[in-house]
């Protein structure tokens, strides 16, 4: 069970259980790439950080300027240099990463290798949709 932390004020935190938790855990056992999409500020990042906190995932956010610049400059190199299972947050900022993820996951389709989050569904991007179907 995972809870979402909501800070009500400086001293009070409320926890909200999310039903998506079990679905995420099941998907991580089946698929090499798991996408968590949704509108801004709905708890995607918090969900992922809580669910995967003790599972050995390395977390990368494309809100970090240096991470963003590296990913934009060399999407394939960025993905190939990641170690272990990874979370890439805000994937919509560098959609070219999706093709690199496809390539790497085709080479090694280990379940749960990539968890990506974003506020734009990459499957709606014409250049990406066909490449990632079924992953």
Map each language-model feature to its residues.
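Phosphate-binding site recognition
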Residues: 1-135
